[in-house]
Amino acid sequence: MKVASSLVGGRDPSPELAAEVVHNALQAAGVERADSVLLFLSRDYVRHAQPAIIAAARAAGTTQISGCTAYGLLNEQGWLLDQSGAVALVIAQSPAPATGDRREPLLSFSGHHTLPYDWQALPARAGLLDAEAVAWAHGRLAGTPGAEVRLPGMHARLASSPGLRLLGLPLTVTATTGYDLRQLGGLAAVDSLQRCLPAGLHAGAPHRP
C-alpha cells in the first residue's frame, strides 16, 4: 500500500485546485493513480464542490473520492485558514479486504446540526460533523444523513481524547514567527511544554529537532 498527502492553497475555489492537490499527492506517493482519495475542501467550496470532486476523480483515476468541506485544512506539512484550499490523501495499491472484515475504519461526514440518529449506535465512527458542511462519497455529493466510507485494506483502532487539560499558569508569549509560536516565558515553546507536562507524559512529548 502507498499513501501520501498534499495541501494546496489558492485565490478561488476552483476545480483546478482540487486536481492539483491530487496530482501532487500522487507524485508524493510515487504512483500514477489512486484506489481511493480523501479530499477536503475549504468552506468556500460549499457551492462549488461537485466540479471539484469531478476534477479530483479525473486526476486520481478513480471515482472513490470522499470527504467534506471544512473551516480549516491541514496535513503533516502545514495548514490553511481563511483561504481557498484543498487537502488530499491518496491511497494506492491497497490489498483486497478479507470477506466480512470490519476492522476497516468507518469514516463519516455530515452537514447536520446534530449527530444523525442512525449514527449514534455501533459501529464506531470517526469523521466530521459541521452544520454548514457539504459532504461526498464515491465521487458524489451525499444526501441525508451524510457521507460514509470505509478505507479498504486498512486496519485501525479508534481512540478518543478526554478533552483539554490545563497544564499550568498563563505564560507570556515572547517570540513568534508569523502565526507560529516560538517562545513562551523566554523558553523555546517545546521546552516550555516539557516543563509543564506531568511526569508520566514526558516520554510522548515532542522534542526539539
Q: Model-flagged regions — what are they?
A:
Residues 1-36, 40-46, 50, 55-57, ...:
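Small-residue-enriched flexible segments
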